[in-house]
């Protein structure tokens, strides 16, 4: 706080991975983020590398700490989706992903390989039959990736915010490197994973509608996108199971979307 001459400007938020505090640097509002786990630092490096293009700007960084732009707008993608405008929310997420994946002039920073990110799924699939189809699909996709680029890794309604005149921008990347199709898979399980009490992603017809929008926006092959959705939902369910919450709402949402995607693929 002293080094960057910051003043506290709100309540401290604690997550499993970070401490996040609204601050001011002179007249400038900002967010101070301090990592609680080493994995966060790849995301810090990626956010810095994006340099405000499609993502929040980074004003300063140090070991385990990041001073970043604060969202100033009143828009909320989850509320937009719940209000009957899910198609519009989906398009905003697609546009944000496209900006993040656009070529940059310099080489990317050191990031987590997507193959390593999927290890929890591969470990647990041998013990949990419900995860086996996703693990099989993930292995096939990871063995022959396409359009490899830096990935956000957690691109959903809560991580794309309204920055006023700067538009919708991403925050909180995991910092991965892999096939860009993966970054779109998270759209298909949210905002339900953030608020299971307000189902949307699992409603009849929603997966098909979102699939149509993403394919039209990106040019992806529908079958390959469905396979990445299957892989992603398996990984997400594996995380819940690994945390001892395999019977909870989060894993149930993942497995429901997984089953819908497999039916469409068949």
Curated annotation (Swiss-Prot):
The keyword ATP-binding applies. GO terms for molecular function: ATP binding; streptomycin 3''-kinase activity. It catalyses: streptomycin + ATP = streptomycin 3''-phosphate + ADP + H(+). This is Streptomycin 3''-kinase. The keyword ATP-binding applies. Its EC number is 2.7.1.87. GO terms for biological process: response to antibiotic; secondary metabolic process. This enzyme is encoded by the kanamycin and neomycin resistance transposon Tn5. The active site is at 154 (proton acceptor). It holds the Pfam family APH_6_hur. The aminoglycoside phosphotransferases achieve inactivation of their antibiotic substrates by phosphorylation. Belongs to the aminoglycoside phosphotransferase family. Keywords: Antibiotic resistance, ATP-binding, Kinase, Nucleotide-binding, Transferase, Transposable element.
